[in-house]
Amino acid sequence: MSRSRPAKPSKSVKTKLQKKKDIQMKTKTSKQAVRHGASAKAVNPGKPKQLIKRRDGKKETEDKTPTPAPSFLTRAGAARMNRDRNQVLFQNPDSLTCNGFTMALRRTSLSWRLSQRPVVTPKPKKVPPSKKQCTHNIQDEPGVKHSENDSVPSQHATVSPGTENGEQNRCLVEGESQEITQSCPVFEERIEDTQSCISASGNLEAEISWPLEGTHCEELLSHQTSDNECTSPQECAPLPQRSTSEVTSQKNTSNQLADLSSQVESIKLSDPSPNPTGSDHNGFPDSSFRIVPELDLKTCMPLDESVYPTALIRFILAGSQPDVFDTKPQEKTLITTPEQVGSHPNQVLDATSVLGQAFSTLPLQWGFSGANLVQVEALGKGSDSPEDLGAITMLNQQETVAMDMDRNATPDLPIFLPKPPNTVATYSSPLLGPEPHSSTSCGLEVQGATPILTLDSGHTPQLPPNPESSSVPLVIAANGTRAEKQFGTSLFPAVPQGFTVAAENEVQHAPLDLTQGSQAAPSKLEGEISRVSITGSADVKATAMSMPVTQASTSSPPCNSTPPMVERRKRKACGVCEPCQQKANCGECTYCKNRKNSHQICKKRKCEVLKKKPEATSQAQVTKENKRPQREKKPKVLKTDFNNKPVNGPKSESMDCSRRGHGEEEQRLDLITHPLENVRKNAGGMTGIEVEKWAPNKKSHLAEGQVKGSCDANLTGVENPQPSEDDKQQTNPSPTFAQTIRNGMKNVHCLPTDTHLPLNKLNHEEFSKALGNNSSKLLTDPSNCKDAMSVTTSGGECDHLKGPRNTLLFQKPGLNCRSGAEPTIFNNHPNTHSAGSRPHPPEKVPNKEPKDGSPVQPSLLSLMKDRRLTLEQVVAIEALTQLSEAPSESSSPSKPEKDEEAHQKTASLLNSCKAILHSVRKDLQDPNVQGKGLHHDTVVFNGQNRTFKSPDSFATNQALIKSQGYPSSPTAEKKGAAGGRAPFDGFENSHPLPIESHNLENCSQVLSCDQNLSSHDPSCQDAPYSQIEEDVAAQLTQLASTINHINAEVRNAESTPESLVAKNTKQKHSQEKRMVHQKPPSSTQTKPSVPSAKPKKAQKKARATPHANKRKKKPPARSSQENDQKKQEQLAIEYSKMHDIWMSSKFQRFGQSSPRSFPVLLRNIPVFNQILKPVTQSKTPSQHNELFPPINQIKFTRNPELAKEKVKVEPSDSLPTCQFKTESGGQTFAEPADNSQGQPMVSVNQEAHPLPQSPPSNQCANIMAGAAQTQFHLGAQENLVHQIPPPTLPGTSPDTLLPDPASILRKGKVLHFDGITVVTEKREAQTSSNGPLGPTTDSAQSEFKESIMDLLSKPAKNLIAGLKEQEAAPCDCDGGTQKEKGPYYTHLGAGPSVAAVRELMETRFGQKGKAIRIEKIVFTGKEGKSSQGCPVAKWVIRRSGPEEKLICLVRERVDHHCSTAVIVVLILLWEGIPRLMADRLYKELTENLRSYSGHPTDRRCTLNKKRTCTCQGIDPKTCGASFSFGCSWSMYFNGCKFGRSENPRKFRLAPNYPLHNYYKRITGMSSEGSDVKTGWIIPDRKTLISREEKQLEKNLQELATVLAPLYKQMAPVAYQNQVEYEEVAGDCRLGNEEGRPFSGVTCCMDFCAHSHKDIHNMHNGSTVVCTLIRADGRDTNCPEDEQLHVLPLYRLADTDEFGSVEGMKAKIKSGAIQVNGPTRKRRLRFTEPVPRCGKRAKMKQNHNKSGSHNTKSFSSASSTSHLVKDESTDFCPLQASSAETSTCTYSKTASGGFAETSSILHCTMPSGAHSGANAAAGECTGTVQPAEVAAHPHQSLPTADSPVHAEPLTSPSEQLTSNQSNQQLPLLSNSQKLASCQVEDERHPEADEPQHPEDDNLPQLDEFWSDSEEIYADPSFGGVAIAPIHGSVLIECARKELHATTSLRSPKRGVPFRVSLVFYQHKSLNKPNHGFDINKIKCKCKKVTKKKPADRECPDVSPEANLSHQIPSRVASTLTRDNVVTVSPYSLTHVAGPYNRWV
């Protein structure tokens, strides 16, 4: 049924009156004939007219048009047809759930209507309101008298308080009797700002008008029951003057207005049972209701078209509404029927005198045979607001309503119960079916707010096939004596066919802890499900409970009533959907094009709700249905509550507010605490019957045994729970949860099951199926349940939403609500009910807050409030916890079925999670609820229930159970567990139900609900913690998938204790123990008996590791966990750092100190079924306790010790994003994903986006994806730190647009190292559980490494870089189809034009005019280079004169005119540093480096690609050189304290030998030994070196200090990027003052750098180059020999900056621009390529195999060297041997020195990197004799003297950086140690001898003529050069731009023409160990990849190798022959396997 939207509050009353008049006119013409069957039950189609009393005092009579009877097949039709229902509904968005049916404000579901028998409605006797009742004037109308045969008339009262005026809106009460055939009566609630709500109900044969006198109705006369018992008169809270209810008979078309009078019309639905008369009356067992006066029935909505006194409604509402939601009483509304709730979310009912009148109007026939008359006592005004008449005790104590019904018929009396926060409303109703007399008592525990139970009120479809099933009106007695609010409801129309699902919107979750019929499990009401809707005060202003009443007598006079006029009002746009958000017309659609002639709104802006055709039944509803929950035009309760309340706010309303679709499907059970969002759209539209059928098909399958056993269990299986906002408000706990449900429930497939189905009717098995094998678990009986809603908590799927006014929502799918079979749980406290099978009356239920382990702890609530965590987040945490525990239970009997159920359950879980989130929000809103309610709220789910465990899911469950109806005492818990409350046990035990496969569904549903909530609910939207929510969503998704897997794995999980369960058990241990003990006996049975039901669940749980079993297992599990924990701890230790960071980042978001808790939580949940269970449980629980409960629960195997160790691992600066690191970060997660217990464990780095590891069920994944998108930033931004493949971790939440994060994590392995995240496919081994914790630590580590290597070995796409290159900003420019040429970056500067850039530079520099020069360059992409590949300068830009201070090279982006159309490529300050400083620096630096050779690095850019050029010169004494200082990428091995060198010397000088190693390798030249020895012999050499190093450091530090401000001035953006994390690695930064952007400096002395990019420089950073020129070139503009800085890919533009060609020519003429031409020059080159570093050594080592292999032994001396060596070899082409040899070659005898060196030098740094002697020694492996080489593989590297050195060793930096000038890999500090090694040994002639053999192989020089004419002739080749001068400072982005420096004709390193000091920051400076670990991994990966092919070839390498293998075939002796002979005995034999190579 489409939901009617509430009329806009702004509409004038006149307009409404006019419409009403029109409708009345129509009504007159169309009247429905009333069926009367004397023997057959007939429903009088006549519908009473609703009277609206307006504040202005105007009275208008509205004739309601008869609503067409909907066909049985259409929900809408059903809704329209019958609004009258035998049940009294609390019009609570949260809707009461009874028998699995949820009463929502929406109209009854079609199935319900179909199921109902025809009802004959006698006119009730008029009962004068007691004087006490109302001060308001009441207009008396003739009441409809009920004949004796008539069973109970249904009463409907609609009260809408005017929130703005602070007055309650008038409530129009209409009573209608409907025929079952037509369908369940449909209610429309309309909430108007000042206008009263009109609810149209089915036609009533007679209309009852109640005269109300006085504004306050203190007493309501109740009709005496057949027993003639009268309830004592009760006081009625004053009814707001505005509110009046009138019922007009059909005959009387005019609407009569009664000021305070409300008409109650009870409609008796004839019971299908053969007894047409009133036998039904007898069938109804005694039911007593205790209503807390505090329950505020501000507004009463007529349920089932029955009219209830507003006072009654308000009375009901008073108790429930105000407290929970903190909403204004005015805003509170009570929606009688779920449909109404769904249809008219905004409608507010005034319940002021409704209750009293309603009860007084009840016919005497209503007395229950053999049942005690229900006494209605007014406890006092429950409404918080003055308007709330909750205090109104509508019923006179003297008056009693006795309802006589067949035992077969289940009395379903529509009742409006106000539930005061402290009061307890209890009622017991006989259960139909096997135990017709059994009554269920629901304890509603609302702290300050009444939970609202939506029990398919008025929607309980009675299946025609079951004559017995009938609804008996229940009387609610308000008991002022009860401080606690308990509402026991046992409304279970027995429907033999099984539970019927209320109308789409009708079925709603019962927010209250009502057993809701599930308690009455013993008496299976297989017949109709009575629905009770109780609105939380906040969300639902009015609550209505309706119970279908079978009319005993057909003799009752038919009442002719005019069909209620449905006021057709213009539906309103929801304002929430995407189209509504669009403000501008598209201009393309037909409506826009025909705007002049068309009045239609743009198609793209048309509301999604309006696009849907309103259902037939929604005509009246439509007005209210489509209300925008978020729009608050006026203080209307529904809208206002939703919009005004923050997600986490105390008010549940905010949580409740969510959009409602037109149809019931769209309607969400926003406020229903347990409204199952089950098939929010699909199932929502279903009729109860359809839903019933659908639910099992969907994931939500009610536990069969349970449902059968106790149909009474309230299942919030509203198909289309469209709780009106009033309803939402009613269920305080649910609003948040309900919203979630509504939002998420749409997604829930099990929504129909969500509707409260008659649990009597439903078998527990069916119910469990609907719940996804999570048999619906009702809370323990009402005595145990503080809130009926808590009772309704689904065992596995739903957490109990406990808290004042928070009602538990049961969502059938996945909802673990106990049906009547479960009632024993409710009956935990001894109850009158026999065998405790039936829930004890709530009175008996102690209102105690949950004991230890209460699901929602104050800490959790505080966290939510203090940490600003959204309810969704908290709930998600709880859900995750619960799911982690529950998964074992969720397993289906058969794996395939389990899988399916798992997927279904996943959806259910998601919905339930959403519901939980809403409920949690409510709880948060209500501080009282925090302890209890949070979990209870969590419990509320749509049919797909997913139990969200708070910190301790079990504790949470217990708390929920305790608070909601489980006995606070352990005994009660035990009873609940034993009484077939296995689900509760599960909750107590850690909510095992979620473990069930259904949990997965629920999880997914919950996630979807969460998404919806976040997207739709203003409160949800308000949550600023979208990231956290996303994480939670991702976690939930993963959990859902995990649960799905668990379903298959549950059995395995059973063997392994669940860590979460264990944790929860700690908190809940005592309770859990009880539950556990009881639970084991429970066997899966469909019997209503509690014990049987429990066994059933126990068995199911056993499959899925039932909670009880889990609890039992927990201790052993802990032990096993401890074993596994040790393993995981080891793993965690390794990866804790990453993980901690990730968690810390998340918790920082949460505002929590220990971020790891949250990740742990994520880990823990999936772990429960899998490996992690044992690990986390043992230690983490205590730690988790510190955190908010969900975290505690979720944490799995966090070992504090490990965490501590992990914390130590890395400095916080390792990850700039996450400056804090968590101790536990390293711990791995195990997520039971994919059906495998073991899965890769994932630790997420703060930066990393967690990706779900195990693929959740499709629903779960999808929902998670949505949720992740909303909540998790699971996107690529966050990098998973690492996964430990052996254990599996359910990835989170969180980034969803990408493939579902959950699916990604589940499917793949995420490894993170130093900011690098690797996502690889999972391995079978990883997923397989090697143990509860997974494989042993060693295996886990090895797998982790392997996975990393695999990942790294794959293309770069597998690597997720922490930083991404800047991409071109989006613009609307016509960039053309081709990709833009040239790199894009703007951190140096950019502008829309060249003129703008000039202005920018002038602003920065501070001067204008000629001081600034702009030159345009064009990117060609073709590198200008000589024929040999060396740099060439085609255009040279020189300084034009002294007035020119700055030159800027800019590039114009083709076809761009945006703000970045022109970007700055290079900035050059001609006078960058003072002249004196430049002179001094040149002098001192050259002296230092000339004397000691510095530490030259061999770089890749040293040579051309062919490695044959001589650009550096051929004289080793004068060749150009490059030295690296500070902390650079090339230096981190030895120059950085993080580079594993004990004594870092970032400015180390290497005074070993003056000659450059590189040239020694090339030329084979060896310096005289005497020279080297002399240097080393000097005693004070070491002291001298130290002094020189200090001087060098001083100069460079000073220069860095001077350049930093200059850099900041000219390139502020780049500067800021480099100093953003200045506090990180502060010791590695250069500069003496704050603001240090540089970490390293490269000193190039006449060094020719071939084209390269400094790829290892920082992202979005720049390189600052300071140039120092020799004295002879400082004053001349064109020196004879110079070195230029070249941009090889750019050419000079044809015009100057102003676009003038002449200007360019003038510059060329003046010499400012020099254009070069081709010249033929004679050059030298090597005939053979110069070998890379270590090549010769390698060759020699090949001859001496042992040498290279032995190096490892030496490297073992220092593990660091080992690492470096491995890393360097892989990362750097440099061979570890080369570095090692350099050190060890010094002394062939001094192995110790070698070992020391080798450890440091292990990284294969190019020997060239070694300075002088060090380089020579290091490079000359040959220095050591072959024997030594064999002995010491490191020595195999050529020494400086050896010819091997002649081979150029490629420096690691060179190889790695590929032409990166800045990145030079200096030798490790160990090289110094090598130098310190005995030189004498090193210089031994023996060392020299090995070189000689190589001399012949040294490259030879050859002359050639360089011809580059082609380059110069073709203008497309680039080659723009700039000639820097002395003291100039150049700024460029060396990482992005290809750059080079030209060679000098005669380089002289001793007196260089140009000294270039290049300052930069390397990319890994801010990472742990400067990326050392990452490089190590890369190197290993490379090694592995390189070794693999070699291994394959190894066997065939040589005969010796074969012999070594001792291949038998090779060893066998054979005779030489000419023919082929085989050793094999058979010629055709083929050997397979590893031995095949032997034959």
UniProtKB/Swiss-Prot annotation:
Cofactor annotation: Fe(2+); Zn(2+)
GO biological process: chromatin remodeling; chromosomal 5-methylcytosine DNA demethylation, oxidation pathway; dendrite morphogenesis; epigenetic programing of male pronucleus; inner cell mass cell differentiation; negative regulation of cell migration; negative regulation of stem cell population maintenance; negative regulation of transcription by RNA polymerase II
Positions carrying Phosphoserine: S854
Free-text cofactor note: Binds 1 Fe(2+) ion per subunit.
Biased composition (Basic and acidic residues): 53-65, 138-149, 653-670, 840-852, 895-904, 1880-1895
Residue stretches of biased makeup (Low complexity): 884-894, 1748-1760
Binding, 2-oxoglutarate: R1499, C1644, H1685, R1954, V1955, S1956
Family the entry assigns: Belongs to the TET family.
Function: Dioxygenase that plays a key role in active DNA demethylation, by catalyzing the sequential oxidation of the modified genomic base 5-methylcytosine (5mC) into 5-hydroxymethylcytosine (5hmC), 5-formylcytosine (5fC), and 5-carboxylcytosine (5caC). In addition to its role in DNA demethylation, plays a more general role in chromatin regulation by recruiting histone modifying protein complexes to alter histone marks and chromatin accessibility, leading to both activation and repression of gene expression.
The protein's name: Methylcytosine dioxygenase TET1
Protein species of origin: Mus musculus
